[in-house]
């Protein structure tokens, strides 16, 4: 009995191919719509977050961070800059806190301009080593134009005044000497002689006082110029330097203890890890 044979075609029909293409296209469209929806929802959330009023907790936390965490970096109390290898910070006096450190160059400039040898706050006298520059390297004092003009006028007036006083004294002394000679001849000294003698004495005393005062002023200017043209090296205060060393050692001790603790933990963990390996090796040998 013969079975009816049906011819089965292995090639898919055109309708099946078009259906598959349509399904793949619809799937691609759905995936694209989903991805677009996610991308649109993400910026909308961002815009909502940006448009929403700022919470009060964020500024408080930021303020607490900035206010609670102190700055561990030391700064100079004159220029408010940090120290480095070229210009390190020193501790020349007993001041503490933000006034504890200062640059060597800043302190030298301040000492030259103020002409003082002690701290203006704690009144501690600086430990200094000074030496003068050579004369050819001396610098002028930092003065304004009005101060220089006053000094020049003062010097000119003093020179003229001293010349007049000396000339007047010379004339009076000469006339007095002539009258003394005449008195020796006649044996009588008239009243103009005593008047001139009193004037000479008063002029001479006034001239000495005037010279003393002016020499004192010029001596102060000379000291200022001398102090300005000296090389100063300020040393650390012994008490503050010892205190800084003690604080640094106290800070480094906990770190060393932590390192030792970590080392012990590592050693214990390694020993605990090696014990099972040894037992396993013994079991294998058995």
UniProtKB/Swiss-Prot annotation:
Zn finger (RING-CH-type) start-end: 68-129
Which residues does the annotation say bind Zn(2+) 2? 93, 95, 119, 122
The highest taxon in the source lineage is Eukaryota
What catalytic reaction does the record list?
S-ubiquitinyl-[E2 ubiquitin-conjugating enzyme]-L-cysteine + [acceptor protein]-L-lysine = [E2 ubiquitin-conjugating enzyme]-L-cysteine + N(6)-ubiquitinyl-[acceptor protein]-L-lysine
State the UniProt keywords alphabetically.
Answer: Adaptive immunity, Cytoplasmic vesicle, Endoplasmic reticulum, Endosome, Golgi apparatus, Immunity, Lysosome, Membrane, Metal-binding, Phosphoprotein, Transferase, Transmembrane, Transmembrane helix, Ubl conjugation pathway, Zinc, Zinc-finger
What positions does the entry give for Zn(2+) 1 binding? 76, 79, 103, 106
State which Enzyme Commission number(s) the record gives: 2.3.2.27
- Quaternary structure and partners: Interacts with CD86.
> What's the protein name?
E3 ubiquitin-protein ligase MARCHF8
Organism placement in taxonomy: Eukaryota, Metazoa, Chordata, Craniata, Vertebrata
Please name the gene that encodes this protein.
Marchf8
């Amino acid at each position: 009995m013969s079975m009816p044979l049906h011819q089965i075609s292995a090639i898919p029909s055109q309708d099946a191919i078009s259906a598959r293409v349509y399904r793949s296209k619809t799937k691609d469209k759905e995936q694209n719509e989903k991805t677009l929806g996610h991308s649109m929802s993400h910026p909308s959330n961002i815009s909502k977050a940006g448009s929403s009023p700022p919470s009060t907790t964020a500024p408080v936390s930021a303020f607490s961070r900035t206010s609670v965490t102190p700055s561990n970096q030391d700064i100079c109390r004159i220029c408010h800059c940090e120290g480095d290898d070229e210009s390190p910070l020193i501790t020349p006096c007993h001041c503490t806190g933000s006034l504890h450190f200062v640059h060597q160059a800043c302190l030298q400039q301040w000492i030259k301009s103020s002409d003082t040898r002690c701290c203006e706050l704690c009144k501690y006298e600086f430990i200094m080593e000074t030496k003068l520059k050579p004369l050819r390297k001396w610098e002028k004092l930092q003065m304004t134009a009005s101060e220089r003009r006053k000094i020049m006028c003062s010097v000119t007036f003093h020179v003229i005044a001293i010349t007049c006083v000396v000339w007047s004294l010379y004339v009076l002394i000469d006339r007095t000497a002539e009258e003394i000679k005449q008195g020796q001849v006649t044996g009588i000294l008239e009243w103009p002689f005593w008047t001139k003698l009193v004037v000479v004495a008063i002029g001479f005393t006034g001239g000495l006082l005037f010279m003393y005062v002016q020499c004192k002023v010029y001596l102060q200017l000379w000291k200022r110029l001398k102090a300005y043209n000296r090389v100063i090296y300020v040393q650390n205060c012994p008490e503050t330097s010892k205190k800084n060393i003690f604080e640094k050692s106290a800070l480094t001790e906990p770190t060393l203890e932590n390192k030792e603790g970590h080392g012990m933990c590592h050693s214990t963990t390694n020993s605990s890890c090696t014990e099972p390996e040894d037992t396993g090796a013994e079991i294998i040998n058995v």
